[in-house]
């Protein structure tokens, strides 16, 4: 079912480049451990889409084209640790963590236009540029205190805290033609 009465074809080409890296470094010692994790994900997409056809009602040829280039990146790193501590007869464990991540999406140039009956439709021409950046910072800890009551009983008290800060910025620029009114 084709409500617009358009017959034609759709072409799409896509070039994609991706890079992924993950690293872990840790150290264990008598009273605990420290662990560092880092992740990097990066990709670029270069896409061309073209829709061409003939509108059967008015016998017009139509072409719709979109050219798009997008870069994406995620960088994340964390540092965490566990320390076992002893206070009088209380066994305790401190788990702590620090985290930082940054996400970027950059679309430095996206173009679209529409051709009808061999003529460029000026109001269809659009160029767009956008940049999205998000940064997250986290700091947290958990503390366990365990105390025994006799040979078979014990209790554990746990508390913790998390401080998290997130910031997002978006810049978007869109340029196109608008028809004017003439006096």
Residue ranges and their predicted role:
Residues 1-49, 72-77:
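Transmembrane beta-barrel wall of Gram-negative outer-membrane proteins
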Residues 2-7, 53-63, 116-126:
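Flexible, solvent-exposed coil segments and beta strand-coil junctions
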Residues 28-43, 66-183:
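Face-selective signature of the C-terminal outer-membrane beta-barrel domain
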Residues 30, 48, 55-61, 69:
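Intrinsically disordered, low-complexity, charge-biased terminal/linker regions in eukaryotic proteins
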């Amino acid at each position: 079912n084709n409500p617009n009465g358009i017959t034609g074809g759709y072409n799409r080409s896509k070039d994609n480049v991706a890079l992924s890296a993950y690293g872990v470094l840790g150290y264990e010692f008598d009273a605990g451990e420290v662990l560092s994790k880092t992740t990097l994900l990066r990709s670029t997409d270069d896409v061309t889409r073209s829709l061409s056809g003939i509108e059967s009602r008015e016998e017009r040829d139509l072409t719709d084209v979109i050219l798009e280039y997008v870069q994406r990146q995620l960088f994340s790193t964390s540092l965490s640790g566990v320390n076992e501590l002893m206070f009088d007869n209380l066994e305790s464990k401190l788990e702590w963590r620090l985290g930082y991540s940054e996400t970027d999406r950059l679309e430095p140039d996206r173009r679209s236009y529409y051709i009808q009956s061999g003529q460029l439709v000026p109001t269809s021409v659009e160029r767009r540029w956008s940049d999205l950046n998000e940064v997250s910072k986290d700091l947290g800890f958990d503390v366990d205190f365990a105390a025994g009551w006799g040979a078979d009983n014990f209790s554990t008290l746990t508390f913790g805290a998390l401080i998290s800060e997130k910031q997002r910025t978006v810049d978007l620029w869109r340029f196109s033609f608008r028809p004017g009114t003439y006096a």
